[in-house]
Amino acid sequence: MAKDHEDDDLSLHDLIEGPTRDLTSARAAALARIQARPASDDHEVDGTSGDPQAGQPHDQRGEGAGPEGRRRVELERLPASGALYRRALLGVVPGVGGRRGADVPGLELAVGGVAVDQRHLADYDRVCGFRLTDRLPATYLHVLGFPLSLRLMTSPGFPIPLTGVVHVANRITVRRPVEVGETVDFHTYAENLRPHERGRQLDVVLIGSIGGEEVWRGVSTYLGKERASGGGPRRDRGDRPAPPAFSAQWRVTPQVGTDYARVSGDHNPIHTSKLGARLFGFPRPIAHGMWSKARCLAALEPRLPEAYTVDVAFKLPVPLPSTVAFSASPVGDGWDFALHSARDGRPHLTGSVR
């Protein structure tokens, strides 16, 4: 029987400062070979050019003025994620990638009439542990609209590179339940670029509306690593608090990485491939952070109100395979919850429902 290697030390310091390596052209080429599917939607939307026709994709419907002075670009359909990941890999190859912007792009991307495939929803529910119902989990709408955000994050001049970016937090607000049969209009933009001790952070906002009414909002916070002279001090792990008593344990197998990639369209090879993980310095693949959030939310599903906000901070990655411990405690009308390593109590995420 293969050893699980649960004692591999993947600390937050290592995640942000360590194994997320700078990609050389050789590493980028190796990762591009892992992405085997041919590109089918590899057209650019340029958020930095003053020319409205610059970088206009073939699936672009029209454009106008969005709020906060952003240029709003309407797409005819959701972009294909695979081509966007390949673009991100090519973007780190010297002489191929463009110059990074000094600020978030003044661009808002939108797509209307996104329908839910009931079989895909059922597949997602099974992978993440939700009940099979016609109501969309809060995290499913993130998956549904994420290709639009991915297009934004791979646009020329986006201030942080997608390759090697660290997803540090995600907040989802559900205004009302969304059911199968409803079509959703999405729009996305980036804001709040700010310095961080390890680089720069920004927020990518994704909003879902039905009939002109906002029903769902997701805010993902990403960290783009940048080299700092001398580096920062290592965190003192002795200050880590003891984990709370757990209410459930889950075995997270490598199949979770491949299954979630299939249902989410997020085929980042650090989640599905030993080679892809090693190219970024991880000894083996790690679980998608949004799978971890979805699995925790599924455990709370019977207790969720009609409208709520679920906020999560991602801590240490979940190596595949491993065993994790879930804990939850009521706080007023909501919940606090967490996911830790069942072996040594290292935190994987902390969250709240309010």
Residue spans of the language-model regions?
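Hot-dog-fold acyl-thioester-processing enzymes
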Residues: G66-H167, S229-R303
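HotDog/MaoC-like acyl-thioester-processing domains
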Residues: G62-G95, R99-R100, L148-L150, V168-V252, ...
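Hydrophobic residues on conserved beta-strands that form the core of alpha/beta folds
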Residues: V111, R217, A307-T309
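Catalytic-pocket segment enriched in acidic/His residues
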Residues: H271, L275-D333, L339-D344
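N-terminal intrinsically disordered, low-complexity tails
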Residues: D7-D46, D51, G55
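Cationic, low-complexity basic patches in intrinsically disordered or flexible, solvent-exposed regions
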Residues: P57, R61
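Short, structured beta-strand/loop micro-motifs enriched in basic residues and often containing a Trp
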Residues: V165-R171, E306-V310
